[in-house]
Amino acid sequence: MQYDTLIQPDNGQAATLIHVTDKSRFEAWLALQPDAVRTAVKAQKFEGGANDIAILPADKTGEWSVAAGVTDVSASGLWHLAKLADSLPEGTYRLADYDASEAMLGWMLGQYRYHEYLSEPKLTGPRVLLVKEPARIAMAALQATATALVRDLVNRPAGDL
């Protein structure tokens, strides 16, 4: 996998918006949302808990956004977006009011798959995250590539090394 393609600089290109919240900020966030979004959130039983996601309707037909719960919005963490990257369909995403600098590596590693011994691997397209701080992308991609190599070695049977 080319990890350096999973995070791209945000140049205003089309992307699905991700709203990040946590349990303590959830009610305030929800109060600012339109009725259709509040109804969708309630129907999906989304409460802003860590690793919870909800698909939200948008004003235009065919468009949508995502609500994602993390442990603590104010303390960006490495793994905050990892499960989200694994759960979303392929596409391009942009974070609303959330600093992804600490979570870039987790976004990349959330898409790691070991397919070596699968007869029919289930391949999915990439989930690309757009970020405002492109200077950190290269280092996060190098760390993801190194971590994936270690994971590959751990997952490979000893007799095949």
Identify what each model region corresponds to:
Residues 1-161:
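N-terminal hydrophobic/helix-forming segments and targeting peptides
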